[in-house]
């Protein structure tokens, strides 16, 4: 089971992504924030397996947020969710587990969840 963090400054999109997460049985908890700072505060006290991050946000961009998440919670897998495919090259420097383009399709999100679960399974077997 995965604990998922969603961060996007667009509230409608944030709600859509969180709703998609809640439909996936392998996700036990979904927390969503429209500001990176709020997400970081929450992460200080709560573990997270997967962070779904928008890249283009006003208070802190998703790339910076990802770096901070990796410092606070090193085991958290990062998946960037954005409407701007040109950010893909910059995002790969963070070594994300994946990259989803908006609007996010249920099957694409499920594919990312399955991939993260396979990584967790591999870690346990090692």
Residue ranges of each PLM-predicted region?
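Conserved acidic segment of CheY-like receiver
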Residues: 2-13, 17-21, 51
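Acidic, metal-coordinating helix/loop segments flanking the phosphotransfer/catalytic sites
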Residues: 32-50
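A short, hydrophobic beta-strand element within the central beta-sheet of small alpha/beta folds
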Residues: 75-85
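Receiver (REC) domain active-site loop signature in two-component systems and cognate sites
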Residues: 55-57
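C-terminal output helix
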Residues: 104-115
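Short amphipathic alpha-helix used as the core "switch/output" element in two-component signaling
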Residues: 41, 63-74
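Acidic catalytic/metal-coordinating carboxylates
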Residues: 35, 61-64
């Amino acid at each position: 089971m995965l604990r998922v963090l969603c961060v996007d400054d667009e509230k409608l999109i944030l709600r859509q992504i969180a709703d998609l997460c809640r439909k996936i049985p392998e996700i036990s908890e979904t927390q969503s924030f429209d500001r990176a700072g709020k997400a970081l505060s929450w992460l200080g006290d709560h573990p997270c397996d997967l962070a779904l991050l928008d890249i283009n946000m006003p208070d802190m961009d998703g790339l910076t947020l990802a770096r901070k998440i990796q410092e606070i919670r090193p085991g958290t897998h990062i998946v960037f969710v954005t409407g701007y495919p040109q950010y893909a090259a910059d995002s790969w420097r963070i070594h994300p587990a994946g990259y989803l383009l908006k609007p996010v399709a249920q099957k694409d999100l499920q594919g990312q969840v399955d991939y993260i679960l396979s990584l967790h399974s591999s870690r346990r077997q090692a």
